[in-house]
Amino acid sequence: MRLDTNSNVDFKAFESSSSSCPVKLDNLATWGGSQKTDTRLPITDYSNLGGPRHNRSPFPLCKDVNNRFVIWDGDMTTLEVDAITNTSDETLTESNSISERIFAVAGNQLREELSTTVKECRTGDVRITRGYNLPAKYVLHTVAPAYREKFKTAAENTLHCCYRNVLCKAKELNLHTIALCNISAHQKSFPADVAAHIALRTIRRYLDKCTLQVVILCVGSSERGTYEVLAPLYFPRDQLEERSALWQLPKDIGGEFGEPQHPDPDRQIRIIRNPQHSVHMRHHLADDDSDVSPHDMEGNSSDLEYGARDMNGLSLNSYSSGLQAQLQRDLDRQHLLSDRPRTGVYENVISEGVEGIEHQERYERLLRRAQVEDLTEVSGIGCLYQSGVDRLGRPVIVFCGKWFPAQNIDLEKALLYLIKLLDPIVKGDYVISYFHTLTSTNNYPSLHWLREVYSVLPYKYKKNLKAFYIVHPTFWTKMMTWWFTTFMAPAIKAKVHSLPGVEHLYSAITKDQLEIPAYITEYDMATNGLHYFNPVPTAS
């Protein structure tokens, strides 16, 4: 299955004249249009063979999608599009064939912006810069994961995040044409076919949902064959290709956004058969000042297994160290002693360990979803945001209750946005200012949902929260706060402070660091007047 590229200018011709001869989208053959001049051999009809892997087409024929997708073997830096992509390392200084070409055409201004402004990009994330001398307006930078067979689940998930985050950023910026490079191309250990399936599947799901975007997948001559063979599985151009895909598509066809859906055994706790260690109690788990909690095992196997954080630092040592290694030994011990009586203390160690792992895995799944899903319907409300720092330099999170439409919003997406905003902040101390000003019953979520949110958030959220200010509380607010912190969240009860006015907040947060809507200050002046409180800096 060969894509006709006669209408595409040769790569070497562009290499010498990229700045003077930009390639317009109209000069490229779309995937749907390539069928007219395609010289493929007849496709094998699998209908007479055994049963297909799928009963119905997961990726049905769609001419509109095919006409917004291009596979192109050419120099990406010559494309006159809204954005192109660059794949690099976390310092954004890696030298590979893709980045070198982009830097050569864009000029030194791009390097300067990366070194002075952007500085770094985590694996799976995306950073944006201007295109400078490139025909493209912007460059979207991302970092592909390293591939290890032991951690293939994490690598595949993170590569999906790379593609998904780049595409979502393009949509967020209202970019209509984007050129994607083969993001995993410089990771030689990443299986080419696996990477191609992830890329094509993610692009197809994106184009299904975003009907105004055009995606150009730029591949090298050595990669083109793989993508042209696999593309009909996700972008069928006729009924025969669609029917053949039922047999040829892998069982894992991804989730709603193309994310890998791994079988259950990959997500289960690994039990070794010959454990050599005994059970040791970890007394610091009960210490509230510790950075480690049964519900907060950052940097251990959960990160490694699911790719939510740095994938370049994977090592067997980090995987088997710390709390996770201790819990693993406990579980191994349980496996061997399953038929023997156990003490209550030992059972508690096991149950807490399993519960902690499951809790962390759940949070990591939500975090991955928060990083890839479109949350503009929540972020656009403006009810939750970061506003400067307090007098001790801690980030201040502002929540405006009046602007939170609890009865008319997808509360699951609200939770995802909360996680997306707070996850990079809660690694250190932080404070929250909740403004109850002029709220109504339509702004009150159920206590069940609040309890669910509190239980989902890891230990670091509670430990590093140093103050929770409630401004303009009502009698109802005070009663519900007392009940919630007494029976559901006693760990934060001493950190909650009810303040009758905004000026009381200035004791902890200077006025220039607090950005709040005008309706709050207007209500405060109408209720309390002016200069009703002389703030004295505190170290709350």
UniProtKB/Swiss-Prot annotation:
Residues 56-235 form the Macro domain. It holds the Pfam family CRAL_TRIO_2. Transmembrane segments: none annotated. It comes from the Eukaryota. Residues 371-528 form the CRAL-TRIO domain. One of its GO terms (biological process) is response to oxidative stress. Disruption phenotype: Shortened lifespan, impaired locomotor behavior, and increased sensitivity to deleterious effects of stressors such as reactive oxygen species and nutrient deprivation. Locomotor anomalies include righting defects, reduced and uncoordinated walking behavior, and compromised flight. Belongs to the GDAP2 family. This is Protein GDAP2 homolog.
